[in-house]
Amino acid sequence: MGGGEVSKEMGACSLAYRRGDQKLRKFVTARSTKFLLFCCIAFVLVTIVCRSSRPWVNSSIAVADRISGSRKGYTLLMNTWKRYDLLKKSVSHYASCSRLDSIHIVWSEPNPPSESLKEYLHNVLKKKTRDGHEVELRFDINKEDSLNNRFKEIKDLKTDAVFSIDDDIIFPCHTVDFAFNVWESAPDTMVGFVPRVHWPEKSNDKANYYTYSGWWSVWWSGTYSMVLSKAAFFHKKYLSLYTNSMPASIREFTTKNRNCEDIAMSFLIANATNAPAIWVKGKIYEIGSTGISSIGGHTEKRTHCVNRFVAEFGKMPLVYTSMKAVDSRNLWFW
């Protein structure tokens, strides 16, 4: 056999080998891709089956939730003003929450609640009765129209926990229950769903001056220093401190300006604890019209409040944090 023929045969063998190797690689790659896809699908199916086939997990968690910490549950403290349809919707919704003990409606209108309104709400609560326990409903009537009324001391509260909420905000009951669990782990602090932040002014001519910032600043920085009382848990003792111990000038300021009582409460709690508030992740449903936060000059007014309260307290008590409480039971990965 000549050298040319040997060379041709070797070239043909090399070409056949390369083609075979390419086919093998394609085969292995296709098999690997299919296997990986199969594993992913199997993982998802197994996870779903495991969650659905272990009802004892959720039931045991629910039992632990009911017996842990404050066995009496929490009091819903709802602020309202001439929005009766919203009030009815909110009370009807929260009456279904399993750990709710009572509802106190902060009433500051010049006329008392109508008998038809009271009858409607009481009937709603009767229909929502569970395990023989009917949620107590009370109207806390105030003669003066003041934002401070939402934090007026209630001496005969049965629960330590107070869930302060506006009448136009709805959270799923399981979300409220989770926030209550978080509060039970830190009952001296404020636990809520609506974070806000203050920032120190960097200019030299404004030493110890702070700017109030809203949600987008929190989202961008990942930092907050307060949670708003429009949707927050706190201990009932802070109602007494707000009413009896906080400087009267602050309460007068909030009454006159009709703003910032929520910031004042955040200052009060942070000053008492030297600890940050806790932000809880939760889907919020606002069923009312646009609030005062959309009115022009809102941020400037809130900034003025922050600096006024710093002067009253003699320091900035709010504490920065980046912690966020998330219910891992609702996440695939955590």
UniProtKB/Swiss-Prot annotation:
Tissue expr: Expressed in leaves, roots, stem, and flowers.
Chain sites annotated for binding substrate: 145-150, 166-168, 196, 258-262, 289-302
Signal sequence annotation: none
GO CC terms: endosome; Golgi apparatus; Golgi membrane; trans-Golgi network
Pfam family, any one: Glyco_transf_64
Lumenal face of the membrane: 50-334
Consequences of knocking out this gene: Disturbed production of mannose-carrying glycosylinositol phosphorylceramides (GIPCs) in gmt1-3. Dwarf plants exhibiting a constitutive hypersensitive response characterized by elevated salicylic acid (SA) and hydrogen peroxide H(2)O(2) levels. Reduced cellulose content, but increased lignin accumulation in cell walls. In epc1-1, strong growth reduction, mechanical fragility, defects in vascular formation and enhanced secondary growth in hypocotyl tissues probably due to abnormal cell-cell adhesion properties in hypocotyl, cotyledon and cortical parenchyma tissues.
EC number: 2.4.1.-
Keyword NADP among record annotations: no
Cofactor(s) required, per the database record: Mn(2+)
Catalytic-site annotation from UniProt: D262
Sequence similarity: Belongs to the glycosyltransferase 64 family.
Primary role: Mannosyl transferase (ManT) required for the biosynthesis of mannose-carrying glycosylinositol phosphorylceramides (GIPCs). Maybe involved in cell-cell adhesion that maintains the integrity of organs by providing mechanical strength and facilitating the movement of metabolites throughout the plant during development. Prevents abscisic acid- (ABA-) mediated effects on development (e.g. cell size, flowering time, senescence). Probably implicated in beta-(1,4)-galactan biosynthesis thus being a cell-wall synthesis-related (CWSR) protein.
Protein name: Glycosylinositol phosphorylceramide mannosyl transferase 1
Gene this chain is encoded by: GMT1
